[in-house]
């Protein structure tokens, strides 16, 4: 089961999946020049939502269709330090109608 972890350090916002840096997936859509963010709605949180969904779902088209709702419902409400597992992401996707 994949585990996604986000936190802040002097180097900025860092997000990992199973201990490895999460790919921002700029190849799908470049929403944020500054990388990932969370705790609010905006470009950085949208990039994180897209990256989380693309990695979790393995379906780029579905990730592109869902990332804005996922950003508003999940990413904007994350704490400064957070952890999400696959079951939590699946539950959030069901909640937003994905």
Regions found by a protein language model. Give the residues of each.
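Amphipathic alpha-helical packing elements
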Residues: 6, 11-66
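Short, compact, well-ordered microdomains
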Residues: 58-96
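Long, low-hydrophobicity ectodomains and other hydrophilic envelope-associated domains
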Residues: 1-2
């Amino acid at each position: 089961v994949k585990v996604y972890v986000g936190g802040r350090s002097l180097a900025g916002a860092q997000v990992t999946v199973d201990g490895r840096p999460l790919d921002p997936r700029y190849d799908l859509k470049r929403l944020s020049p500054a990388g990932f963010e969370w705790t609010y709605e905006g470009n950085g949180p949208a990039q994180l939502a897209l990256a989380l969904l693309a990695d979790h779902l393995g379906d780029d088209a579905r990730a592109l269709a869902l990332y804005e709702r996922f950003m508003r419902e999940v990413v904007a409400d994350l704490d400064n330090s957070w952890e999400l597992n696959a079951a939590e992401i699946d539950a959030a996707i069901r909640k937003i109608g994905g």
